[in-house]
Amino acid sequence: MPSRDFPRTVLLLLLILATACGGGSSPTAPTATPTGQQTSTPTATTLTLTGTVTNIITGATISGGVIEVGGETATSGADGAYSLTITASSTQSFSASASGYYTRQSSVSMTGTSVVNLQLIPNGDGFNLTLFDHLFREKGQKGTKRWTSQPTFEIWTQEFTCLETNSNGEACIKYQAKGTAPTIFETNVRNSIAKMGQLTGSALSGSPITTKTHSVGTTLTHNDWGTTVGTISFAYVTGLYGENNAGASGDPNNKIHIDYGANVYADQTIHLHEVAHAVGFRHPDGSNNMPQPGIMGPWPYQWTSADERLGRILYLRPTGSLTPDIDPTGTIIN
């Protein structure tokens, strides 16, 4: 029988149909949907916040203050008192505002305490936000830094010679113990420490003061100083360290060290300036470029009521506080 030629198109169609039929393969079973799995919903909690709203500087009660938590609001009365009930299942945003005051922003825990007394910062009454941000927030660019526990003040009884300085000569990076430091050095350190309660709203009153004597020839390095975390140490330094130099290095809640040169160790105002650095004060543009005179500058340094007022507020707010009055992430006000 003569062969029959099928057109190529027909052969291709037959091949496609055979493939589509699957050649007798078993069908794939549909994927089973899990049963019995339920998404848990957090249980809502009801919390009634109560308290009094006052001026952080004068202590006067604030009428008409608006407290807002998670969309719910309450207003303080003539006596500054407020009450606000919230029902929610998680941490809620919090704010407290009033005419003539900076708005306080934080968070509320639905399982926290129910009494929250609020101290708002006035736009006035001796508070200067520009100065506060300059002193404590790198001109408003960063959060504050302050001690959250009592530091230990450690006075070194030896004179230290500086064997090596940093590139600009302003800081000693290698020290060696010599003989006894002048008596007036320890006296001035103790006198400056005694003022720290005034500069921190009494937060750092009563911090322990110790002395440390190093064996002659002991060598120490910058950013270690042989001290423990939580220590503010003081040294009388000669050698390569500038006679007119004084400086504090380190960070609150870690360790801080202060050096005093041969021409400045007897100057009480310089001691106060450096200890103010140790508790959180700064001069980001240098001591001769301050918004107004005070303990940070310009020279000659002046201890002012503004320093005391703003230092107290620094320690009434959590470390990391942002301008104008925003608690750092994770802060719970109750």
Regions found by a protein language model. Give the residues of each.
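Metalloprotease/metallohydrolase-associated module, dominated by Zn2+-dependent proteases
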Residues: P252-A266, R282-N334
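Glycine-centered loop-to-beta-strand initiation motif
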Residues: G51, S76-T87, S114-L118
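Structural motif
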Residues: T41-G64
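Disordered inhibitory propeptide/activation segment of secreted metzincin zinc metalloprotease zymogens
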Residues: T28, A32, G36, S99-S107, ...
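A short, solvent-exposed beta-strand micro-motif common in secreted/extracellular proteins
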Residues: S90-G100
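Metzincin-family zinc-dependent endopeptidase catalytic domain
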Residues: K178, P182-N289
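Short, acidic Ser/Thr/Gly-rich low-complexity loop/linker segments typical of extracellular
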Residues: A60-S63, E68-T85
